[in-house]
Every structure is written in C-alpha cells, then in structure tokens.
Regions:
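N-terminal targeting leaders
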Residues: 1-175
Length: 175
C-alpha cells in the first residue's frame, strides 16, 4: 500500500481524478467485452478523463460504434480513436508492443527531465502514444526518448500541456 501511495503522490492528477480515470477504463473495457466480444481488440487508456482507444475492429462501422459508445460514457471528456479496421492482432504483435512500452518506461525512469509517474505509455503495432500532464519541454524530451527506442515506428502525443507555473503548483500540491 505504501508503494501505491507513493505513485499517487508523484502523479500530477489528484487522487479523485485518478479514481475517475480507473472507473472509466473499467466501465469501458467491461462494456466493450460484453457488447462486441471477439469482434474487437480494444485497449482503453485513460488519463485525466481523456480516453485513447487503440487496437483493431473487424469493420469501419465497429470502429465508429466503439468510439461513440465510449464518448457517451459518464465523465469522459475526450476520445482519441486510434482504432484500425483490420484483422485482430496476435500474441506476437501484442508481446512486442508490451516490450516496447517497457523499454520506453525504463528510459523515462532514467531521465530526470521526464515525469514518468505523470505519464502513460501505450504501444499498438509499434506506434507509441504518450499521455499525461506535462510541460512542453517535458513532452519534447519524452517524445525524443521514445523515438530512439529500436522498433518504434511512430510517436503520437496525447498530452495535456501545462505551464511551468502549473507544473510547480501541481508538483507542490502532491508532495
């Protein structure tokens, strides 16, 4: 429990927002499994009430339906629909994506200019999505680090950008 508390403190989201984000993720995942089953492979990532959808759907219509359904959920402020209408990815592709995510997170931890606990890394088909509450300078460092990881095809920013003053305020409030 102490470890979890430390992560909450380092996260720039307040504990209430973190809880809302987790609730959105769980609700969306449960809904998608029940409604679409094996017709989709959707990863739901939530940061600061903004939802990133990655993965595959069997048709373009399903891609649109999934995004619309999630957008209508309580507490969701934005949906970034990065789903593709394609055959569902296999274990090998998903394992490679998990490996890339781990490599990027490790590189972030090694750089004091990246607030790794205020960021989320999502990888799908070699494309990396970075979410979080960061300054423009932090975003640029994170993007450059992610781009340098072998196997990364593309890096997309899904950040909430804040000023240096907001960074100091948020970091101070969470100590």
């Amino acid at each position: 429990m102490l470890f979890r508390s430390a992560l909450v403190i380092a996260d720039r989201r307040n504990p209430g927002t973190q809880s809302i984000d987790r609730g959105i993720q769980l609700e969306a995942e449960s809904f998608l499994i029940k409604k679409y089953g094996d017709n989709v492979h959707v990863n739901v990532s939530v940061f600061n009430r903004r939802v990133l959808l990655t993965g595959e759907t069997r048709t373009e219509q399903l891609k649109s339906e999934v995004a619309s359904s999630v957008k209508a959920m309580k507490n969701v402020s934005d949906v970034f629909n990065e789903l593709v209408a394609a055959p569902l990815s296999g274990l090998s592709a998903r394992t490679n994506d998990a490996y890339l995510t781990t490599r990027i997170k490790g590189a972030f931890l090694a750089d004091k200019n990246v607030p790794s606990n205020s960021m989320k890394v999502v990888t799908e088909a070699g494309k990396v999505y970075l979410m979080g509450i960061v300054t423009e300078a932090e975003a640029n460092v994170a993007v450059n680090i992610a781009r340098e990881v072998p196997g990364v095809k593309q890096v997309t920013k899904v950040f909430d950008l804040i000023s240096e003053a907001d960074k100091r305020r948020l970091d101070g409030a969470n100590k």
